[in-house]
Design a protein with these regions (language model features):
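N-terminal leader/targeting and accessory segments in enzymes
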Residues: 1-106
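Phosphate-binding loop of NTP-binding sites
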Residues: 96, 103-143
């Protein structure tokens, strides 16, 4: 059970796409997918919301370790699991990576790179809401 929830809704990307996104972090693939062209639906980090077709990324945090919930994710129909160590006895492919948090970022980066639009971030302690509302008004007037 992680505090974070789903991240990346997929347009049904393939297992092969996922392997390519993780290539810099991937150590091994444990278990075979039924088909490399089989597709997943979304990426999640909270085992409580896993649905059939989801990729579950097991993140380790201060309070809990997502690896404790691999069985729950598998039983909920996870398409595959992104893990730092293999959990035996699960009938779902496990993509073993050096660091699951970094792998999570690689998946997000690969997804984001599919789109050729600019991305802007607003950070800081004060004024974020005002700044984003002003940006929205300016951009809406132009587009």
């Amino acid at each position: 059970m992680q505090a974070e929830t789903e991240v990346i809704p997929s347009e049904h990307e393939s297992f092969k796409w996922l392997l390519e996104a993780l290539c810099d972090e991937l150590v091994e693939v444990h278990g075979d997918p039924a088909n490399e062209d089989a597709s997943w639906i979304r990426v999640v980090t909270d085992s409580r919301i896993v649905r059939a077709g989801d990729v579950f990324v097991a993140l380790s945090g201060e309070r809990t370790d997502g690896h404790r919930y691999l069985l729950q994710a598998a039983e909920s129909g996870a398409f595959c699991l992104v893990v730092e160590h293999v959990e035996t006895g699960l009938n779902v492919p496990q993509l073993v990576v050096e660091n699951s948090r970094r792998a999570y970022g690689l998946i997000a980066r690969a997804w984001r790179r599919r789109f050729g639009i600019a991305l802007t971030a607003v950070g800081g302690s004060n004024g974020k809401t005002t700044t984003t509302q002003m940006m929205k008004a300016i951009l809406a007037a132009h587009w």
